[in-house]
């Protein structure tokens, strides 16, 4: 399940 994480002010979905 991909978890939404904030990176550099952008939301990136990583598994």
UniProtKB/Swiss-Prot annotation:
<keyword id="KW-0964">Secreted</keyword>
<dbReference type="GO" id="GO:0006508">
    <property type="term" value="P:proteolysis"/>
</dbReference>
<feature type="propeptide" description="Activation peptide">
    <location>
        <begin position="1"/>
        <end position="15"/>
    </location>
</feature>
<keyword id="KW-0862">Zinc</keyword>
<keyword id="KW-0121">Carboxypeptidase</keyword>
<keyword id="KW-0378">Hydrolase</keyword>
<comment type="similarity">
    <text>Belongs to the peptidase M14 family.</text>
</comment>
<keyword id="KW-0865">Zymogen</keyword>
<keyword id="KW-0645">Protease</keyword>
<protein>
    <recommendedName>
        <fullName>Carboxypeptidase B</fullName>
        <ecNumber>3.4.17.2</ecNumber>
    </recommendedName>
</protein>
<dbReference type="GO" id="GO:0005576">
    <property type="term" value="C:extracellular region"/>
</dbReference>
<keyword id="KW-0482">Metalloprotease</keyword>
<dbReference type="GO" id="GO:0004181">
    <property type="term" value="F:metallocarboxypeptidase activity"/>
</dbReference>
């Amino acid at each position: 399940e991909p978890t939404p994480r904030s990176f550099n002010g952008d939301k990136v979905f990583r598994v």
